[in-house]
Amino acid sequence: MRTALFLLLLLALAAIPGSLVPQVTSDPNGVVQYKAANPGLSTVLDALGVFNTYSSIWFSAIYLLLFISLIGCVIPRTKHHFDALRARPPKTPARLARLEGFTTRETSVDAEQAVATARELLKKQGYRAELYDDSVSAERGYLRETGNLVFHTALIGVLVTVGIGGGFGYTGQRVVVEGYAFNNSLSSYDSFNPGRFFSDSALEPFSIAVDSFVPVYEEQNKNALGQAIDYTANVTTTLRGQKPQSATIKVNEPLHIGGTEVYLLGNGYAPVVTVRNPDGDVVFSQPTAFLPQDANLSSLGVIKIPDGLAEQIGMRGFFYPTASTLDSGALASVFPDLINPTLTLEVYTGDLGLDNGQGTNAYQLDVDSLTEIAGRTAAQPTIKLGIGDSIELPDGLGTIELTAVPRFVSLDVHHDPALAWIFAFAVLVVAGLLTSLFIPRRRIWVKAIRGTDGSVTLEYAGLARGDDPTLEAAVADFADKHSDRLGLKVEP
């Protein structure tokens, strides 16, 4: 049992990195940002599997050892418990005076009748009682050990069902811009983490369209100005063969659809940039999610345009919902809502590496092999746009316009087929724990000693297995009730 407790503590400690470092399964964008901000440390953490803490080898090893240890505890204890349930209560000790709550009563009632009455009364109080000559031995509280076994068995059940759910379930993340939708298919996810036994058939067809995203920010309290109060994503869901339905997703209030839970993880802005070639033809016009960098949603983003212009163009920029110029001359956002939206872009030309067959990060731009044509080190200054502003690109490449700034939401889709079983076992864990903590395991003996003058002395005593602060009172209370049943007068 000590080994199981040690492993349980070790498992809790091993789970700490999962709450300190962003996880690929729940916050892939956060992982990207963390790696960009800590390139040296992230290499070590990645090698150790910290970004996938709960599926790492070391975490799984602790998990499996705990599972084996619990089974090793439960099986022998269960056998011992069943043997104890079938066994008779132990014989009455020779000297009850050494036991807790010892008390005596004098009676003229026949010893056999007194003991038989005690046995009957003990059975009514839920004791298993057995007669031994002129004494009765009784015990109760086996439900305490039953609760203990239920607790440990249910804990094993939780571990098993979590493993099954992880094996057959999946999690996926998708960034969805206002006015757009996504379908529950593999190709629609930005990142997807299937279980070991996942099958495509587990993806129930449905779609979620984000109609609007409504944030509420603090505007009255100057000390908390701009602090988020509430987020609401208004969506339209469609299941195969059913009519579209309106729904909302809030933080900690997921949407239940198609056997999945859809959580609202994050949000931000997705500026719509429209680029035209020198002839005025639109070569690029779509929203691009910019990743928030602070509480006021100053956001960083990358736009890549591989086709339609004389050269491939990559742009790296910042978006400020409420732009304000600092004393240093730099821009910063002072409020997370759209009050003075401003987009700044550094423009690069060259091979973006999109045609070499290797995957690239949509949120990063490798500028080592590119030429900056607008920005801090270029002849042309950084491009600065407000909504509706249009500016010519350097070198006569065309024009660029900030058309609109919709919001985007980051959705996490979670499917766990064992969720109901996990909940059921969790309830059993709590029930078993409470039972094992609050139901006392105790024994009570009543012994009749015959005197030479024909009188009978009744001795009462008890014994607890573990702490039982109410045992003495229970023995005294039973002695009083037994005396009352026999018609004895008890002096106060």
Question: Where do the PLM segments sit?
Answer:
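Solvent-exposed, non-transmembrane regions of integral membrane proteins
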Residues: M1-P492
